[in-house]
Each structure stands twice: as structure tokens, then as C-alpha cells.
Amino acid sequence: GANNGSMEFDRFTEQAGFTGYFGRNEYGNDKDFDGNWGIFDEPFLKWTANKMSTLPAPFYSEIFTISSHHPFTVPKQHIGKFPKGQIPMLEVVAYGDYALRKFFEEAKKQESKEFDGINI
């Protein structure tokens, strides 16, 4: 869900021969923008699971999540939901785990059998 152009992932995917790149611009809903890096993990991963279910098989996909990057913010609706620990990053790592779990729940709902090949 990163801003298009972040770390030049969009340019790399094109140069590497990939046929598509999906980032903040393609997501198209800035109400989920974190104010810094891009789209918060939970909504972007849900959107990604739905998007992946429409891709022709076989396909290869990589996902770059943003929440574990400074300034370590979680969406307003999740503030106080995750343990903070002694370092700021712990709260966003817990949020990232939550978002990833929601991604797999969404992926299981899809009819595509391509989700059987997900690796982390």
C-alpha cells in the first residue's frame, strides 16, 4: 500500500517484466492513507486479497506493507487495541499481524484456488 514511487518498486516491477503494480494510486481511497507512507495495512491487504482473486492463474504477487515503518502509526479505530510494549514499534507489529490475519481470512473467502500457494 505504499505511495507509488516508494523505493521505486513500481519501476522495478516494470523493468523486471511484471505486468502490474498496485500501490496507493491503484487502491484509490485516501481515507485509508496513513499520512506518510501509504495505505494502512488492514484495508490494503483486504483490497489486495480481492484484487488477487481476479488475476489470471498462474500469477506471482508480492506485498509491501507499511505499518511497521516510522512513524509507527495505527489507524484511529485501532488505537489502544494492541499492546504498546516498551518500544513504539511493538504496537504496529501487533497491528501488522492482525492485518495479515485478516488478509488470510479474506483470501479464504475467495473462490480462486491460487491462494493455496501463498508463502510468507
What are these regions (language model features)?
Residues 1-120:
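Solvent-exposed soluble domains appended to multi-pass membrane proteins
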